[in-house]
Swiss-Prot record:
Parts of the chain that traverse the membrane: 15-35, 88-108, 117-137, 165-185, 191-211, 241-261, 274-294, 313-333
Subunit structure as annotated in this protein's UniProt entry: NDH-1 is composed of 14 different subunits. Subunits NuoA, H, J, K, L, M, N constitute the membrane sector of the complex.
Protein name: NADH-quinone oxidoreductase subunit H
Organism from which the protein derives: Geobacillus kaustophilus (strain HTA426)
EC number: 7.1.1.-
Alphabetized UniProt keyword annotations: Cell membrane, Membrane, NAD, Quinone, Translocase, Transmembrane, Transmembrane helix, Ubiquinone
């Protein structure tokens, strides 16, 4: 129904619906960012034997992130004298905008989606790569050696892990016969691809953590090595753009893993009475929890280990997975 309205003859009602749905998605994502950060701090606190935020907004610290955001907005916005001012100002926007653009092709249920394009997976991968341009630009424009090194690390990491990420997703595309995300979910009606493609799921999840610059692959902003990495010279709301982009991508990547490998909104066979939106939310939250669990568990790897793992381990395994998938599909389907 919603898709028919969006694709019908342009009019004021379509425009109002378009902006209304966009505002709704923005509100949902911002709510996730707000309480996703809180959940991450609480979960990590529990795993480390701490309480976590418990002062602002009651005993559970429900308003702690809101207070942190207000603090960021009230901080002074400084620009280094030696910085390339236009590029320094533009870089956070370049990093932030693609994070929202990728949400347009993510189907959250069989009825709630914004753009049902035939190459939704390709669109996601292509647009998400643009954020690295903003990261590198911010590191270079800051005229700071730590920021520049962080930006270069981000570029090298993205190039290295984008390849196994894409190649692991090719196994899913081979089984589904489409790069349309809705079709990929439909192909998992009987068997989720996490069972048909366990190796691809493992490769994709590891590469996704690297793409998100999260522990143990957070080398572009390694505090113990680079102070704060590519955004070391940023403060206030400009720094908030980089942080917001990181957590919006966490939202998007968790949703993409749910779509590609966990059956999207399809339920477990004997629990079909539960709505698809609830199933999607449960799977999505499980993926987010695993990503938080990684951060609280693994130590940061060295730069040489990061590169070797991508090129010597993940890339060969992704090639093996493609060959096995092609053979199985040719012989049994």
């Amino acid at each position: 129904m919603m898709e028919q309205w969006l694709e019908s003859t342009p009019g004021w009602s379509n425009i109002a619906l378009f902006f209304g749905l966009g505002a709704l998605l923005l509100a949902v994502v911002l709510a996730f960012v707000t309480y996703g950060i809180l959940a991450e701090r609480k979960v990590m606190g529990f795993m480390q034997g701490r309480i976590g935020p418990n002062q602002v907004g009651g005993r559970f610290g429900l308003l702690q992130t809101v207070a942190d955001v207000l603090k960021l907005l009230l901080k002074e916005d400084t620009i280094p004298k030696a910085a390339d001012r236009p590029l320094y100002v533009l870089a956070p926007i370049i990093a932030f905008v693609p994070s929202f653009m990728v949400l347009a092709v993510l189907p959250f249920t069989d009825a709630f989606r914004f753009a049902d394009i035939g190459v939704g997976l390709l669109y996601y991968i292509a647009v998400s790569g643009l954020t690295t341009v903003g990261v590198v630009a911010g590191g270079w424009a800051s005229n700071n050696k730590y920021a520049l090194l962080g930006g270069m690390r981000a570029a090298a990491q993205m190039i290295s892990y984008e390849i196994p990420l894409v190649m692991s997703a090719l196994g899913v595309v081979l089984l589904a016969g489409s790069m349309n995300l809705v079709d990929i979910v439909a192909a998992q009606k009987d068997v989720w691809f996490i069972f048909a493609q366990p190796l691809a799921f493992l490769i994709f999840l590891i590469a996704a953590v690297a793409e998100l610059n999260r522990t143990p692959f957070d080398l572009p902003e390694a505090e113990s090595e680079l102070v704060a990495g590519f955004h070391v010279e940023y403060s206030g709301f400009r720094w908030a753009f980089f942080m917001l982009a990181e957590y919006v991508y966490l939202f998007a990547m968790a949703a993409l893993v749910t779509i590609l490998f966990l059956g999207g909104w399809h339920p477990v066979a004997f629990l079909g009475w539960i709505p698809g939106a609830v199933w999607f939310a449960l799977k999505f939250c499980a993926v987010v929890f695993v990503l938080i669990w990684f951060r609280a568990t693994f130590p940061r790897v060295r730069a040489d280990q990061l590169m070797e793992f991508a090129w010597k381990v993940l890339l060969p395994l992704s090639l093996v997975n493609i060959v096995l998938t092609a053979v199985v599909k040719a012989w049994f389907f």
